[in-house]
Swiss-Prot record:
Top enzyme category: ligase
Entry protein name: Tryptophan--tRNA ligase
A cellular-component GO term for this protein: cytoplasm
Subunit structure: Homodimer.
Catalysed reactions listed for this entry: tRNA(Trp) + L-tryptophan + ATP = L-tryptophyl-tRNA(Trp) + AMP + diphosphate + H(+)
Molecular functions (GO terms): ATP binding; tryptophan-tRNA ligase activity
Amino acid sequence: MQRPRVLSGVQPTGALHLGNWLGAIRNWVDLQSSHDTYVCVVDLHAITVPHDPERLAEESLSTAALYLACGMDPDLCSIFVQSQVSAHSELCWLLNCVTPLNWLERMIQFKEKSVKQGDNVSVGLLDYPVLMAADILLYDADLVPVGEDQKQHLELARDIAQQRINARFGSEEKPVLKVPDPLIIKEGARVMSLSDGRSKMSKSDPNEGSRITLLDPPELITKKIKRAKTDPQMGLQFGNPDRPEADNLLGIYAILSGRGRDAAAQECAEMGWGTFKPLLADATVSALEPIQHRYQQLMGDRIELIRVLDQGRTRAEETAQATLQRVRQALGFLIAS
């Protein structure tokens, strides 16, 4: 029986943090043994906003190394760099030509980011969701792990596939593109900022104390957790909308300590912040230590790391080219012999 296919990825710019790991990568690790898993370093997305060209390649390698250090197995999944598979850019262009402009202008993330960019906002930022659609549709993905903030982008990919490609160039019996479904994983899916329990932990937050990166040393982790925003109440609990920081930090502890939500809630029900924060810091340091150790090993052997990426690229290109050929034929292009 063919395994359901999953596609996901993370931008290489900025250090990966607890939110990336607990909300995404940890779930990919669980999926890879039961799903045909494609994981890419989405460097083409990274250049839709100003970036440092002298750091992009190194950050791409670093991100791939962290995927592996977190438990992704190149024998069970395909790990590759997005820009090294040219079909992403070509399919994006083909999808651009059938996607209405107003579909992109209503994207919430574009509205938010374009305000920050002002007059410097790029066409690439507007077109980001179409490139994301190309990423997904290229691999005939059955499922796409998404958080709440990415659901709108996946819905766009589904609409492009159904309404703009399959309905116009295919048939119900013979669709051109597979329409993917969302895979929304609840626990740990949304890790919030250490400085604001109502905002998602983010690489782009100018306050570095708002996030714990996967490569932070123990003393910095302890410092960030010590300074994390709290409230004046004694005892930690889940589900109180007036205590978002308690919910967030207790949720992180439940996962990183391995205790689970029920046991963590019981343990910390009457605990003060002064007692809880060192516990959380110790659990975080212990959880990240093996990842950091493996990462250093991988970055010390660039030849092996690049071999893994080449292997993943070869697999990805085979799948992507087959999809791209179907789309070219459906749109009526002259196919090279």
